[in-house]
């Protein structure tokens, strides 16, 4: 847990068998100024989190504006929610100006990646696979770019690739999408894209 810290490195840990989030960074809701910046979360193996006991959690959870914070090279899987919210990587309220790259997240009971709301995050070169409710979710459409999503691999099993209020203000480019059953891809609920 790194609440109001900066220049912290959380690396090379095996984190498992917890009822809530594996790594938490930041603790300011919304877009207010935060003491959290330039943190690095890397090379962690995070798994068996939640056990269907708690909700609103992630293998890696962030909160608030965090310029320079980097989440990379983490392996996150088997995240199990009680009622809602079991994600591999979860930038929650106001999480902004972060780089999320080269992570693998799979077998989550919600989507693998969820951004509640935030500004100008870069999400690239990740693999998100077999989320129970799809691959990627965002909660709020905002006037600014919420996140840039590029060069990622999304693997689904008859689930939507993206879920959210609508396409939102996202930049998506150069991603690879695949359904393990060879079915037509569900880009978003109620819409099919071949």
For the regions a language model picked out, list residue spans one by one:
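Glycine- and acidic/polar-rich repeat regions and solenoidal domains
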Residues: 1-194
């Amino acid at each position: 847990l790194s609440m109001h810290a900066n220049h912290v490195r959380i690396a090379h840990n095996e984190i498992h068998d917890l009822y809530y989030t594996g790594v938490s960074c930041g603790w300011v809701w919304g877009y207010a100024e935060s003491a959290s910046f330039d943190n690095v979360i890397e090379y962690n193996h995070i798994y068996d989190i939640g056990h269907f006991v708690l909700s609103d959690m992630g293998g890696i959870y962030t909160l608030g504006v965090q310029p320079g914070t980097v989440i990379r090279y983490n392996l996150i899987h088997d995240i199990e929610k009680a009622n809602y919210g079991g994600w591999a990587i979860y930038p929650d309220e106001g999480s902004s100006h972060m780089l999320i790259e080269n992570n693998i997240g799979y077998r989550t009971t919600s989507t693998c990646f969820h951004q509640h709301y935030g500004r100008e995050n870069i999400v690239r070169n990740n693999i998100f696979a077999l989320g129970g409710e799809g691959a990627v979710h965002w909660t709020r459409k905002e006037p600014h770019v919420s996140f840039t999503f590029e060069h990622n691999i999304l693997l689904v099993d008859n689930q939507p690739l993206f879920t959210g209020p609508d396409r939102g203000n996202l930049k998506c480019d150069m991603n690879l999408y695949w359904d393990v059953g060879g079915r037509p891809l569900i880009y978003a609920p109620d819409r099919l894209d071949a």
